[in-house]
Amino acid sequence: MEVQFENLFAQLSDLQPTSELDCERLKATLVNSCYQYLHCKPSGNYFIPRDHMDALKRLRRNEDIIISKPDKGNGIVLLDKVDYVRKMEQLLSDKTRFLKDNKEKDLTQQVEKAITKLLSSLKQRGIIDNNTYERLRPTGTIVPRLYGLPKTHKPGIPLRPVLDMVNSPYHALAKWLCSRLEPVKKLLSQHCVRDVFEFINTIEGMNLNDCKMFSLDVSSLFTNVPLKETIEFLGEFIEQNSIDVGIPVDDLKSLLFKCTENVQFKFNGGLYRQTDGVAMGSPLGPLLAEVFMAKLENNQLSNAISKCKVYKRYVDDIFVILNKVHDPKTMLETFNKAHANIKYTIEFESLDHLAFLDVSLTRRPDGSIRRTVFRKETWNDQYVHFRSFVPMKQKMNLINCLAERARKICSEDTLADELAFLHQIFLKNGYPKHLIEKGMQPRPASDKMLTVEKKCVYVNLPFKGDALAVFTERRLSSAISQAFFAAKLRVYFTTTPAVRLQHKDKVPSSEASFCVYKFSCSCGTGYIGRTTRRLTQRVREHHPAWIKSGVTKTINSAVVAHLVETNHRVNVQEAFQPIYKVNGRLPKTIKSRILETAEAIAIKLFKPVLCSQKQHIRALQLAWPTSQRSIDNRQITPIAFV
């Protein structure tokens, strides 16, 4: 908790305080608010009954099931583990897409070195600056993990394979490449819509007289994208159109191949490689899929598309309005001949009705289109229950967002029915009638006044009830606005899910990176340190192999010095433990800053003996009192947002 408040104050460092006195008052308020919030117990009004919690614990301990979320929609899905593994291995048995890595060796560190080498070359040639290099250079990453999401809306409940690329060596670079290629994507995507609302604007006022309406679906698009063909086409398009993406085309292609080709991943303890196609979960997946589809649409399919009155695509879902003189089945045959990798399926109107994305479209007798919100058959009337332990703001935002969504999707003759339906659904989910009516009111358009823009500073706190949340937010906002006129506070409250999903391979604590760790000797002497690399690498420096042989070599660690001087022996796995881990989804520069702060706070609070001579400890801005409590008994919450 202290890390959050220390980091909050650090975000104000580039602003001018109103006075030194107000700044010191703010510091005192932050320390006081931190410990007041830390010691407050969560409100008991929303607690899950004990028998319910016991049942959830039994589910978590049951090794014969997989706890997952559905591929689409809300809810929890319980899967038989044997059946889940069988379905996933059946997907992985496709030799044209996946390959079992028989070496059974995690090559993450080798991938880190290869990407670092490519980035170093770009930096040396002045293509990227040092800040970009440090931000993209992979450190302390883990092998991507594959999991499957059950498609509960389809017969047999097939699984959609998803690759968790967060904190992998490819992730930061892939996101950066996506940002560089966004202008190229916009130029290519003539037929693409960003969301359902852009789609509605496209068909607004359309008439279906003498026309046929149908949809096409691309089967398994991501895994069927031919990487080499797509990346080569992308490079040619950039060169032919003289698009400046800030990086030479040859280097761009090298980086794209490094992030997508032969990616090693883990499933059920085994290591595999994806030999072609892009993975669901990779930041580059949607971009390369979009580039490939645009290639087909602008070349092989351009003549067929030109015959359509409307042709709009969202990723792999396509909506078509075609004049009756043309045959949709002939068009389907043309599409299926466009590329050997890609197959399309077609869905026609049924009783003048067709669903596309979140919209249900109905042909009226006069040819106009009636619109309402579409929900799949598996939808279960479930939203966040009013008794759920989440902030009231989130509940009110849910009502307002769904009402606004209905106003944008529905036509005039269906809007009232949709709003009435939402009203009943929220009543079923425990919401009071007056809050539903309040939340469904249209938000008035706010007149933006021309004022000096303020810097937003952020703090993330575990949610402990609405009363405490409102009080803390008001107190912090008042103190910050008084000390720094140019600052604006944003407080984010997080909740811990009652049921944690269990569909990914667990990451061993020894592979933790960007973490603060503790060393506990058998004599009670302690040490606290930080590492951006994998913990196992840092531990080898604290406890080198030669320490057991009796041969003394160069000592550059307080832990090594202590063990050599005292001749104490420790169990490495028990002696070194991570006590704080920074959220892997944060940018690297922010993670590094938070990590330094977390280490400094831990040393300040617990004063481990072996850290007395430690150098390069981040200077703390707030006056944290020294704690006499054991670090073993202290709850340390990882940062989720900055």
Model-derived features: positions:
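Charged structural interfaces that engage phosphate-rich ligands
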Residues: 1-642
